[in-house]
Amino acid sequence: MKLKEDASTEKLRGGYYTPLSLAKFIVNWGVTNQVSSILEPSCGDGAFLEALKKSSGNFECTAVEVLDSEAEKSEMLVQNDLRFKVINNDFYDEYKNHLSDKTFDLVIGNPPYIRYQYLTEEQREEQSLIMTSNGLAANKLINAWVSFVVASVQLLSGNGKVGLVIPAELLQVKYAEKLRMYLMTHLQKITIVTFRELVFPDVQQEVVILMGEKDTFHEGVHQIKILEFDNIDDLNSNFHPVEERVAFKDIDMSTTKWTRYFLSKEQNALINKIKNDRRFVPFVEIGEVDIGITTGNNNFFSVNKDTVEDYDLGDVTLPLIARSVNIPGITFNEPDWIQNVEAGAKTYLLDFNNVSEAEMTVGQKKYIAEGEEREEHTGYKCSIRNKWYCVPSIWSPDAFFLRRNHLYPKFVLNNVPEAVSTDTMHRIRFPMFTDR
């Protein structure tokens, strides 16, 4: 994890700018004759404004940007076009003081992806205000994009539309569960566009497009559909035929899981049939599944053989599987680990939990001290520990579950005593006396 002072401007602002072709798609979808007011809450260098400028619509657009240089670029893009007003300010501050009592027919943009620890104290308070005022809990796991989405939906007019480029985490992570329920409740129709290829390859961040429609006078069930395309070109070329072919599905308000909406009616029927078949059992009846070890700084806590020898770390290390490529088969055995060690891979995890400072060797103390000199301990996870170098929840599992493993997930039996993994994979513990 980078320190705040060392993090890039993109990370601190959370800005990885939207390709113009994608901005044009969202604008073309969102702008209609009924749209008279538009909000762009984080306009960056103005991709959405450039797309909007080419529209002949009679609207007023309010655009907000926190960085002076980017706000200036956006201002230059729309100069002399009286439909636009660019505000150089933090959206949180603008929301609190000027926007919270307004509504817009269309909200579009690419909200910033900023982790909680990169927010200022004032931003954290304002983010919390957005969440709690909309009936959602605020916590330290919530990324800035979540609060931007909530605010965007809140600011919609009675028949407003929202079109946002957001992380695919919306579909996957636990901390987005409440957000999914919020969207299901407040939007009458939701279309999610996913991509097989990366839209932002430089940051390896999967994104989706949230296209939501509000209808205050709507009665009946809310609906959702999920569409998949190869890339932006495929989206622009084939959106309408794909969109017409995929029907909306009624939203089940009793669950926040959206997996079923990816599947066809026949596929969902098959899954329900399997659930009711006594030959199958839920995995929870077989074993306990937990995320791998979250070190807070894999670069510091995961080391290779040379580092172990240089700093006398042998007594405070455990065998480590750091990456899925370190496990070629469906079992992890001693020869596999030794092969990884000899290949120079980071195959040791540091565990200082069972050694006091007085018991540490000179080399071990030196390794920690050099880490502190490099400020390895200032990341969020490390900084909240009593002893930053003592990683919690270290235990060796019976098996590993590799959820992101090339073409398919993989279940690997662990035959190496004390072997552990980082949070790149899940770990599984069987009940006592289970015949593995």
Where are these regions (language model features)?
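N-terminal, positively charged/glycine-rich alpha-helical extensions of SAM-dependent methyltransferases
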Residues: 1-7
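Glycine- and acidic
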Residues: 7-12, 133-135, 421-431
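Signature of N6-adenine DNA methyltransferases within the class I
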Residues: 11-12, 17-25, 42-52, 56-60, ...
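Glycine-rich helix-loop-beta junction characteristic of Rossmann-like nucleotide cofactor-binding loops
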Residues: 28-33
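Conserved class I S-adenosyl-L-methionine
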Residues: 35-42
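Conserved acidic residues
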Residues: 36, 105, 398
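Alpha-helical interaction/dimerization surfaces of two-component signaling modules
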Residues: 55, 77-78
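Polybasic, glycine- and aromatic-enriched phosphate-binding surface used to engage nucleic acids
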Residues: 267-436
